[in-house]
Amino acid sequence: MLEPQRQVIQSYGDGGFKISGLDHAGSVIVTALKTQSWNLASIAEIDVKEFCGKVKSLGELNVLLLGTGTSTLAPNPKLGANLQNLGISLEIMDTGAACRTFNVLVAEERLIAAALIPT
């Protein structure tokens, strides 16, 4: 049986991402097996309840990387607490660092997702 293709973030910038050979404009949420659009332009737009519901629907996760653009910006403090209640650790960093970290952790077969705002 063939394993589904793992998602690899190949590049980022100019308002989007190249992930496993496909171009994605705007923000995205990436897991090891899929990439989906995320209708968000900045960290300030995150609705904690809606976002936590979206993350919960992704399946089993241990870590969520939040790439906040060109610099590291703090989201609503309730976001980390709500994700922790779901058993998910939130790691906040600039988008470039989040992309690199995602690729390493996916290669290690960790239960991870990345929510990425483009640079």
Where are each of the predicted segments found?
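Short glycine-/small-residue-rich flexible loop motifs, especially phosphate/cofactor-binding loops
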Residues: 14, 80, 102
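Short glycine-rich anion-binding loops that position phosphate/pyrophosphate groups of nucleotides
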Residues: 35, 69-71, 118-119
